[in-house]
Amino acid sequence: MAREIIQPNSVHSTTGVGYSHVAKAGDTFYIAGQIALDVDGNLVGKGDIEAQVHQAYANLQAILDELGGSLDDIVKMTTYLTDRSQLDAFRRVRDRFFSDPFPPNTRAQCFELGVL
C-alpha cells in the first residue's frame, strides 16, 4: 500500500528534523505526537503544563481540521507525561477538547519529551 506524507500548514514545520506530522495510507491518517510548539516553532508555556497540553491538543485539532476531520474521528491515543503529579492538570485541559466517551488512551510516564 502506498503512503503519502503530509506537512500541514497549520502547525510548525518538521523539515530537517527527521519526522513528519502526518502519513496517509489508504483511508487512514497517522498523526505524530504533538508537543507545545506554535506554528512558528516556538515553545508555548515553558514550565506551565496546562499551557503546554493545551498547545499540543490545539496542534492536533488544527491538523485534523486541515485534513477535514475532527477530534471525534480519533480512534486511539497515547499520552506521555514526565511527572505523575501532572495528571490532574492534563485531565483538566483534555476535558476542554474531549468529552465522554473518550477515545482509548494509553498513558505513560517518561523521563523527558521532545521539547525541554
What is the predicted function of each stretch?
Residues 1-58, 62-75, 81-116:
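N-terminal presequence-like segments and the immediate start of the first folded domain
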